[in-house]
């Protein structure tokens, strides 16, 4: 009877697991306030798949923009390619569990507030002890017009995880939080398919079309601004419509845009685009385009007017060079004198320490000699006691040991001259003219200052003459590429 009850208890314990292997399950995808269920996942092929509408995802973005002053384009821009995280980072804890963090870095190295931040990390809330996630090689996603297909492969169905998808060009990021659940009775409705028949492809590479974009920028500002392009991000985005962008007419400081949409309703398009985005109907149309170009971060500032000098600056340069030379010479002389004085004092202190160490070594050597004499005296006494047996060594049947203490090294240490006489502290010349040390150092400093002053007097006029004739040698070539009448 007891065996029957034990078998029955084990059957009821493992019955849900056995039945669960054959029952279909799916993953629920929560985005903001909406939930999306994946297709049924079975143990034979554990794959969770979603077909998501990008416009519905944009409407469900409940997070705040992650960066301050982030430029918001979600009200009038087209869809952009989505990027999943290329790798996962394992972060274990002390209890044997832990988290998986998904890490993503944008290849263009974008920084806030330019259309999103550079990198994001999101915790993976599954257990680390037995992870069923198979990392990046099992992530599959495609984008068809405004719909996104995501396929996540697992080694077992019904496992919770968290996923973060970053869409460059959108103001909020998407936090996709998934959890295992049973198949719902009815599939939640998605928004109807949008009329976005085409998406805007990324622009032609900058290697061949950068000059055309700069020309369009100059033409849109009527050739009154200087365009400075930041080479940190050499990539353009989409054709957008931004009628509220204004170019500064007169300003002392350039107006910096994190990303600028230049209005181009009456300009010839530099590239052949067959479809454009209409912000009024929120759709891609093939009618004449009234759009703009999105360029990387650059600054617009008025062209400065070059004024002629009213006075020559050569006397100022002469006085400036002379003052700098004299100041450098005085500072060098003072520094040299102080360094020589400090070197002398340092050598004196080191020599004093060496003499004390030498006295200590000599004293220890004398003590060692006394100990050796005491040992020899004891040895002679023991030899007399064991005279009949042939001495101490034969009585002990051991080899005789003798001391060999030399005094040559100690005598050489005592005969060495002082350290100040062995170290070269001056210029390597004999400056002993019957003067004191400070007088000799002052003489050396004066000679140095005179040499520097002579060098400035001899080489200064030649250098100033060359600098004066340098502006006349510079040529300003005229580039026809920025001519307003040139065709794009």
UniProtKB/Swiss-Prot annotation:
Lipid-attached positions, S-palmitoyl cysteine: 462
Stretches in topological domain Cytoplasmic: 464-488
Keyword match Transport: no
Region (Immunosuppression): 376-392
GO cellular component: host cell plasma membrane; membrane; viral envelope; virion membrane
Superkingdom in the source lineage: Viruses
Pfam families documented for this protein: TLV_coat
Name of this protein: Envelope glycoprotein gp62
Gene from which the chain derives: env
């Amino acid at each position: 009877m007891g065996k029957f009850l034990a078998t029955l208890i084990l059957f009821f314990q493992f019955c849900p697991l056995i039945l669960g292997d054959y029952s279909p399950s799916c993953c629920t995808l929560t985005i903001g306030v909406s939930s999306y269920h994946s297709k049924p996942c079975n143990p034979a092929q554990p794959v969770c798949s979603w077909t998501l509408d990008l416009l519905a995802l944009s409407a469900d973005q409940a997070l705040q923009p992650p960066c301050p002053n982030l430029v918001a384009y979600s009200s009038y821009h087209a869809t952009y390619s989505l990027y999943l995280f290329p790798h996962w980072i394992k972060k274990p804890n002390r209890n044997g569990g832990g988290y998986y963090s998904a890490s993503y870095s944008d290849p263009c190295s974008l920084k806030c507030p330019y259309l999103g931040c550079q990198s994001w990390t999101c915790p993976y809330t599954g257990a680390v002890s037995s992870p069923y996630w198979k990392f990046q090689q099992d992530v599959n996603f495609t984008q068809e017009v405004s719909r996104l297909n995501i396929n996540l492969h697992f080694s077992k169905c019904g496992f919770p995880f968290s996923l973060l998808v970053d869409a460059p060009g959108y103001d909020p990021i998407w936090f996709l939080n998934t959890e295992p659940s049973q198949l719902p009775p009815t599939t939640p409705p998605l928004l109807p398919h949008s009329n976005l028949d085409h998406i805007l492809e990324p622009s032609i590479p900058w290697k061949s079309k950068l000059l055309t974009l700069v020309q369009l920028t100059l033409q849109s500002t009527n050739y009154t601004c200087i365009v400075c392009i930041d080479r940190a991000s050499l990539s353009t985005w989409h054709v957008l419509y931004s009628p509220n962008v204004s170019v500064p007419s007169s300003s002392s400081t350039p107006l910096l845009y994190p990303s600028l949409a230049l209005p181009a309703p009456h300009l010839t398009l530099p590239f052949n685009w067959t479809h454009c985005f209409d912000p009024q109907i929120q759709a891609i149309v093939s009618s004449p385009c009234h759009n703009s170009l999105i360029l990387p971060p650059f600054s617009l500032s008025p062209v400065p007017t070059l004024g002629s000098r009213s006075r020559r600056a050569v006397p100022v340069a002469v006085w400036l060079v002379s003052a700098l030379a004299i100041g450098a010479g005085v500072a060098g002389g003072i520094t040299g004198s102080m360094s020589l004085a400090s070197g002398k004092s340092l050598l004196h202190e080191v020599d004093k320490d060496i003499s004390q160490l030498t006295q200590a070594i000599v004293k220890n050597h004398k003590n060692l000699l006394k100990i050796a004499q005491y040992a020899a005296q004891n040895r002679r006494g023991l030899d007399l006691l064991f005279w009949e047996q042939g001495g101490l060594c034969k009585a002990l049947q051991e080899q005789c040991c003798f001391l060999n203490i030399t005094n040559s090294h100690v005598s050489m240490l005592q005969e060495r001259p002082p350290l100040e006489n062995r170290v070269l502290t001056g210029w390597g010349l004999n400056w002993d003219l019957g003067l004191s040390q400070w007088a000799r150092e002052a003489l050396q400093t004066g000679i140095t200052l005179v040499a520097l002053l002579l060098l400035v007097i001899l080489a200064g006029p030649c250098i100033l003459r060359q600098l004066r004739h340098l502006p006349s040698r510079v040529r300003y070539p005229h580039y026809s590429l920025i001519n307003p009448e040139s065709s794009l």
